[in-house]
Amino acid sequence: MAAVLNLQLKVDASLKAFLGAENRPLHGKTGATLEQILESIFANIAIQGTSEQTEFLDLVVEVKSMEDQSVLGSYNLKEVVNLIKAFKTTSSDPNINKMTFRQVCEAFAPEARNGLVKLKYKGVFTNLFTTMPEVGSKYPELMFDFNKGLNMFIMNKAQQKVITNMNRRLLQTEFAKSENEAKLSSVSTDLCI
């Protein structure tokens, strides 16, 4: 098995256990309830994005049953994000310690996608889809910045194209930003002479 897959599986199991401790959002949750809460958590993270500059909403999210709308669980989004970041920094595994928040979230990309599919029918989309809807076309649930954790081989060609085009656009944007920063720093150095 690939080392990257092993690490993703370890992150998946370890983070579920970490969030399952007493007074945490997954405590006592199993099966379909556990999956629905994870889908909600990672869909909400995907909506805002995993940049270090992202300020997550400090509000309680209730996860409700699809059948009878009973509350299955609830969590504070900002607190859960802080717990995930604490998991990363306090892990005894040096490979997990070195991961970015985005890389930790990649292990839960399928849950994010599943949650985003449900939200799509309620008119809720990720910030990435909102800024580039032409790239997402019919698959807005694939437009999030940790979609690298999705298995491209179980997608159709149109879905693969959405992910490829989105990641290409993000790379172009990052490259343009770094070029502008380099130009600005050379201008400011010239002024100091």
Swiss-Prot record:
InterPro entries, alphabetized: Coat_protein_tricho/vitivirus
Keyword Lipoprotein: no
Sorted UniProt keywords: Capsid protein, Helical capsid protein, Virion
Name of the protein in question: Capsid protein
Keyword match Cell division: no
Post-translational modification: The N-terminus is blocked.
GO cellular component: helical viral capsid
Pfam short name (any one): Tricho_coat
Annotated localization: Virion
UniProt superkingdom: Viruses
